[in-house]
Amino acid sequence: MAIDRAQNLQDTFLNHVRKTKTPLTIFLVNGVKLQGIVTWFDNFCLLLRRDGHSQLVYKHAISTIMPGAPIQLFEGGEDAPL
């Protein structure tokens, strides 16, 4: 069940930044920094767009995703996730 919740949170986050076109900084496990906007994603990869070019990034290669602006995924107080 914990895996389902984690996947749901991941999909919720990625869908939110895709819809709002939030700029992201993505760090890969090898230290490479990528920047852009998510235009599409599935269970295994995401499509990152910047300056008219797209990059297909495999999720297993991603270490950290940092949005360029604060985001609010859930309504609620201290106990609400994120």
UniProtKB/Swiss-Prot annotation:
Entry GO MF terms: RNA binding
Keyword annotations from UniProtKB, A to Z: RNA-binding, Stress response
GO BP: regulation of DNA-templated transcription; regulation of RNA stability; regulation of translation, ncRNA-mediated
GO cellular component, as recorded: cytosol
Signal peptide: none
Domain Sm: residue ranges: 11-71
A Pfam match: Hfq
Its biological purpose: RNA chaperone that binds small regulatory RNA (sRNAs) and mRNAs to facilitate mRNA translational regulation in response to envelope stress, environmental stress and changes in metabolite concentrations. Also binds with high specificity to tRNAs.
Family annotation (HAMAP family): Hfq
Similarity comment: family membership: Belongs to the Hfq family.
NCBIfam families to which the protein is assigned, alphabetical: Hfq (TIGR02383), PRK00395.1 (NF001602)
Binding partners and assembly: Homohexamer.
Name of the protein described by the UniProt record: RNA-binding protein Hfq
